[in-house]
Amino acid sequence: MNRLTKYAVCALAGLAATHVSLAATVRVSGDNTWKVFHDGELIAEAADWQAPTVTEFDVDKNGRALIAIYVHDAEPGGAGVGGMLADIILDDGTVIPTAEDEPGWVCDVGDPIADRDDDWETVAFDDSAWIPLTFYDQFGLGVWAGGTAVMTARFGDPEVEAFWSWCMPNNETDEVYFHYRIGSLAVESEGKLATAWGALKDSR
């Protein structure tokens, strides 16, 4: 093996060792209506919490992407409760559900989406002041348990382990926004430092 061939083999081996996820799927349900954005682009929307959306998307060459979700609760205030359930599945099989042990999920409340013009759904938006989610029942339990069978069929594999969530009490807020940054975690108001996706995966 000459020096040039040896270099090429080593370079290819290095690329294989540093593979980053370049494809992913996001599965979402919201009560009552929702929109899903990937790096600022609308990729899914629906209005039936028992009919979740399952959408493929790409991440950039560094393995980074922003998933931004808006959910509207149609019953104002205490007349009803809102909920959002989601997970992100990377091409290596890693699953990132809405759950307490996935600190990258953050949220905010605000005006209806039609009245919001601050580019909240884009990668450049500063979400450092957003707060952790409030979690309720795990999928298949609680208020939304009645739709489990239908939703499971639509979700497909793998099994959903996410929890229904909201931003602050779900009988008080009706216009809610969510972020998850693949590749890094948002800086939270408590002062948590940004964490590289590689380090997050290594901790699993």
Tell where the protein language model's regions lie, with residue ranges:
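Surface-exposed, short loops/turns at beta-strand junctions within beta-sandwich domains
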Residues: 59-63
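Accessory carbohydrate-binding/adhesion or oligomerization-edge regions at the termini
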Residues: 29-31, 46-48, 64-184
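Short, surface-exposed beta-strand/strand-loop-strand elements in extracellular ectodomains
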Residues: 33-43
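Bacterial N-terminal signal peptides that target proteins for export
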Residues: 1-11
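Sec/Tat signal peptide C-region and signal peptidase I cleavage site
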Residues: 17-23
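Exposed beta-strand and adjacent loop surfaces of beta-rich binding modules
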Residues: 23, 33-35, 85
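Short strand-edge motifs at loop-to-beta-strand transitions and within beta-strands
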Residues: 53-57
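Residue-level detector of functionally pivotal "anchor" positions at catalytic/ligand-binding pockets or at interdomain
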Residues: 182-203
